[in-house]
Amino acid sequence: MRLALVAVGRLKRGPERELVETYRERADALARGLGFSAVQVTELAESRARRAPDRCAEEGAAILDAVPPGSALVVMDEGGRPVTSLALAEQVGAWRDGGRPGLAIVIGGADGLCESVKRRADLLFAFGAATLPHGLVRVLVLEQLYRVMTILAGHPYHRGAP
């Protein structure tokens, strides 16, 4: 199963980028043995349109173009629902075992995501009700992806309740 993180905007150098790379490397180290590819990170340019609806539409089209065909789509959205790490691992494992060719996780731009992206989502996911900086969301997404891998592998990293 191909793994992709699609994000609007570029992550600058700094502690967030270092953490993103740390968790990406950890996930990649477990991926092959679990039937996953290395995580491909795609950074999309932010729209320069003047109006927010136009920016949202441009970014939404770019996001959908970047998602590999047939992939399960997890969309990070403030209106999404929180999901436990175990439930996320179960869902990712079910998609993999059910023959989905890929999993794409999407982080939108500053204006959020247009409805066409949300409608395409298999899961609208939120880390909670708080608004978080995009760099931090990337860190959290990659940490959760690594945690999913450890849960599927039976690795002791995840010590939450079964």
UniProtKB/Swiss-Prot annotation:
EC number: 2.1.1.177
UniProt-recorded Gene Ontology molecular function terms: rRNA (pseudouridine-N3-)-methyltransferase activity
Subcellular location: Cytoplasm
Pfam families documented for this protein: SPOUT_MTase
Recorded family membership: Belongs to the RNA methyltransferase RlmH family.
Quaternary structure note: Homodimer.
Summary of the function given for this chain in its UniProt record: Specifically methylates the pseudouridine at position 1915 (m3Psi1915) in 23S rRNA.
Name used for this protein in its record: Ribosomal RNA large subunit methyltransferase H
Species of provenance: Methylobacterium nodulans (strain LMG 21967 / CNCM I-2342 / ORS 2060)
